[in-house]
Amino acid sequence: MSSLLTIHDLVEGEIIKRPSKYIKTPYVADIEICSNSQLILGHTASLGCCGLADVGAHVLMAPVPKTKKNTNSDKLHCEYRVYLSIIREKNTEIIVGIFPKLAEELTESALKKNLLSRLCNVKTYKRETTIYAPGLVDSRFDFSGIDEKGLPFIMEVKNVPLADYEDISAKERKKMCFDDRDINSKVAYFPDGYRKKTTDTVSPRALKHLNELSLIKRMSKTRCIMCYVIQRTDVDRFQPSVIDPEYREAFKEAVKSGVEIITMVIQWSKDGDAYFVRDDLPISI
């Protein structure tokens, strides 16, 4: 496996309270460092990540770089940032990347190292391109560039930290038993998260990106690519989640329109090393 990046100085902690007792925001948690029982404030970027960074979760975090703002201020601030979550199941540890920005960094590293089979030897690329067409498209996409054949491409990256034996609602999951299932037979799914109504789309922004890529593809010769970065290895397939029918239908339409799908699997170690596993995890739709 090829190495993509390393997060240095990781320490393990257990989330004690979230939101923090001291800073009332869901992005800050009170975390106890496992090695010395010290209680610290940790920044968690992903609103609990559906249990992966909630109370009781074991996480891996790194010190937040010191700046003039947080060293000269008397105000409380986060000393650590949470990057990874540790799942313990059937005497096995699975390390899951939950910091959203990691997905873009991992994708860029894979792009530079020619590991993405659909985007080898690109001539040029850049991060964060805004595309605007009045009444049609108005979004910032993660990558754009020129491929090895001289064709322009746009690529949007989505972080996929979640997986389960079946992609079903929490209510249905309580009725099922997965004790006899292979631990590595889970389905990775996107999107998932909080919403006020079950009929709402989970991520309006993600839906907008997908629909706009479909539109751009239909209107031009630009290659439009969705890259789903699956930051765990206990999976054997990916699918647009059944809990968001609107996104699921948009995904199907995007594929029909010619939008290319990359499903990149990443393996993390407790030392903070990230490795490229594959970019063609089977898709179920």
Regions found by a protein language model. Name each.
Residues 6-21:
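Structural detector for short beta-strands of small beta-barrel domains
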Residues 19-21, 88-101, 117-177, 202-211, ...:
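Active-site metal-binding core of divalent-cation-utilizing nuclease and nuclease-like domains
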Residues 19-22, 62-71:
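Short, charged beta-turn/beta-strand-edge "cap" motif at the junction between a beta-strand
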Residues 21-30:
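Short aromatic-glycine-enriched beta-strand elements
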Residues 47-61:
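Short nucleic-acid-contacting surface segments enriched for D/E, G, S/T with interspersed K/R
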Residues 69-94, 98, 279:
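OB-fold/S1-family single-stranded nucleic acid-binding modules
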Residues 176-245, 265-267:
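Nucleic-acid nuclease catalytic cores
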Residues 223, 233-285:
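N-terminal targeting/trafficking signals and adjacent low-complexity tails
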